């Protein structure tokens, strides 16, 4: 992935957003996991180890989505490794397919920042920040309501 700057071990930010993230205080893993500015996108069926926030930046002006993964059950991690045939963080399970689709010209949210930390063989925590696709809506907003 081009145009990313490593600002800490395992923590990368797109070069266009480095100053903006520093102004927001998003310049360390601890800061990313403590960040609460923006709109909390919690929902009932979201796994307990996932947290999502939508926030905006001014320079460049953009709407961003922060997905954080922490305290991931070991069984979930092992299943991901088996399915992907390699040790992979939960964040990378989001990042890698999106980047492959982008290479084929399919419009996916642009990755702005990402990071992962390991504790021994298992993932400690990871995150990904993506940019909202202009004029897009989430699938949940377009699906019929299930009235069971």
Protein language model features and the residues they cover:
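Juxta-kinase regulatory segment immediately upstream of eukaryotic protein kinase catalytic domains
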Residues: 1-43
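Residue-level preference for alpha-helix termini and adjacent loops
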Residues: 3, 10-11, 113, 132, ...
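Conserved ATP-binding subdomain of kinase catalytic cores across diverse folds
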Residues: 28-139
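Proteins with a high burden of low-complexity, intrinsically disordered sequence enriched in S/T/G/P/A and R
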Residues: 47, 147-148
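AlphaC helix of the protein kinase catalytic domain
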Residues: 138-147
């Amino acid at each position: 992935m081009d145009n990313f700057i490593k600002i800490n071990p395992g923590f990368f930010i797109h070069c266009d957003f480095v100053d903006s993230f520093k102004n927001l205080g998003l310049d360390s893993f601890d800061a990313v996991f403590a960040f609460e500015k923006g709109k909390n996108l919690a929902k009932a069926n979201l796994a307990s180890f996932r947290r999502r926030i939508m926030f905006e930046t001014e320079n460049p002006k953009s709407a961003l989505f922060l997905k954080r993964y922490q305290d991931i059950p070991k069984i979930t991690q092992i299943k991901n490794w088996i399915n992907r045939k390699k040790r992979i963080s939960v964040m990378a399970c989001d990042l890698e397919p999106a980047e492959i689709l982008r290479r084929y010209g399919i419009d996916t949210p642009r990755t702005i920042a990402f990071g992962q930390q390991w504790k021994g063989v298992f993932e400690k925590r990871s995150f990904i920040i993506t940019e909202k696709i202009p004029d897009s809506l989430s699938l949940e907003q377009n699906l019929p309501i299930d009235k069971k």
